[in-house]
Amino acid sequence: MNNQKKIGTAAFAVLVGICSTVAIFADVESTGNLSVALNGAGMTQLVALAALVYLYYQQLINSNSMWHQQKLRERMGYGLVALIFTVCMIIGKEQTAHEDLKYGLFAVVMFAGYVPAFYLLVSFCGDWFYNQSLQQNAGKRPGKLTDWLFEKHVVLGVMLVVFMCRLPYLISFFPCSMSWDGGAQISNFYGREIFTNHHPPFVSFFYGSIAWYSQKWGCANLGMFLIPLTQTTLSAFAVAQVCAILKKMKSPYWMRWGILVYYAAFTVWCIFDVTVIKDSLYVPFALLFGVQIVYCLFFQEEFFAKKQNIVLLVLYAIMMTQIRNNGIFVLLFTLPFVFFVIPNKRKICMAVAVVVMLGITALLDNCIYPALGVISLEDKVDTYCILFQQTAKYAKEHPEDVTDEERAVLDALFDYDELPSNYEPHLADWVKNCLREQEGSETNPTGSHFAALKKDYHKVWFAQFLRHPLTYIDAFFECSYGYYYPEVGTYKEGLGFYVEERYMFTESMSDAKQIEQLAPARFLLEQLSKLEHVPGIGMLYRCGFYAWCVIFAFVYLIIRKKYVSMIVTIPSIVNLLVCMISPVNTCIRYAFGTMCMVPVILAVMWYQGKKE
């Protein structure tokens, strides 16, 4: 390379380095002043600029750099990931940007800075991961503890580790920690509220029967303790099965240790296991279902040789659908791909399994639960939360652009005058509270009011979308950005339920009571959640981080042409899409279905490298 080209390359590296530094340190919240938003003055920024310019320059001039060594497929794949990450960052920062800031102009600078920075980061991670996975680590003998835990006594050993990590929580929060949803489901069982299938009936019966009989038999504390004990046992078993599949895939021991520590010691998993809430039951079965899918895809002969593996797959699938309403979508989008890639001689067996899953699920939902007194909603309004939010934002920003006919339809469904002031991007409940008739109420037990107006509402929704599509797009981003933007923290009780004064106890449905003398221990455990502010570890508490992991994994597997392995990412992707239209933005428990599968996905990526 001649001097003129080197100078041009250096100038380009400096320009891109400046843009990347601006993007990394941008302050879009404090002021509308563009120069202040650049936030470029400071030694930290100078060090970052120097490092970035050096890295960019070396990538461009060094023939042995990642950029020059990568094939076109890798460049396109990593470039796509960098582009997606950049768009996520720009959308996320827009939500908190100062209203006077010319954000569109500033976003152009950030775009020019984020893309190369993310490309460099993603390329490094992808190349390192691939090169490391090619190493077989032959001849390296594990230590005695590692050998005992991950080779000789996987299930027993791993379950013991998980229980030991949960033990401080089980003791300190004895008998349990109560959530609003958990208390509401017990209230359904008690008959204090109309028992609908708004919450999964199976969980309501499970929680409610324990609360009822333990109170009736005079052992409220011991009875309620069965809930966290059951949830912890299920979690421990699920993690043990993850480690068992890691053993089959011969994952490196450092990876097994890291995954075990994540599942066993991460404070979010610990506190939710002792909390009465359906998500704590969903995670183990979602994880077990994912492990069975991995087993089926990569160890087919062994999987289909034992009928119990098919039975377990069916059981875990059914339990997923009965514990969270979105579990059915995981099945419907995952199993067709599994069916497509397995050999023809196995398809009949898998088809029968799918029919059994769906048949039992339909039987429970349409026959068993109604026979037990559960009222089936005609249409669940939570499904339409994002549409309601868009309607509310439209009413707030374009009140003059609503026709009399549209207002009449909307006013029949909502208290229209209250709709604009109740628009809250983080929480759709405020807009749902504007409904004239709440589903599950005495006057509207089946949600028939909304069902009758749904067709007319959709017409109004679509007509207003055509007039102001950007308003609808803005509303969607405002209500969902936390699930793909990793710089925003969790919303309201996102790190767990550390207090007991909830629905069930305040309504005197149970005499269960946490031990007052253990309040200091509960306080100390709550302080552990402050780890979310520690660099690196803090990312584990961000919903958007897990979305990025899944996006990276999905594209990485495309780059490596591991199309069968991509099926393992489908449950996480489905859960992520459901989160984006959910009633609450940045609610970490909604993201559990994605979070719990990320370590399994990473292990599969590593396993595919070992097979080459």
Predicted ranges, named:
Residues 271-282, 323:
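Short acidic/glycine- and proline-prone juxtamembrane loop motifs at membrane-interface regions
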Residues 30-47, 222-226, 474, 478-569:
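Membrane-interface anchor segments at the N-terminal boundary of transmembrane helices
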Residues 120, 229-250:
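Transmembrane-helix motifs of polytopic, lipid-linked glycan transferases
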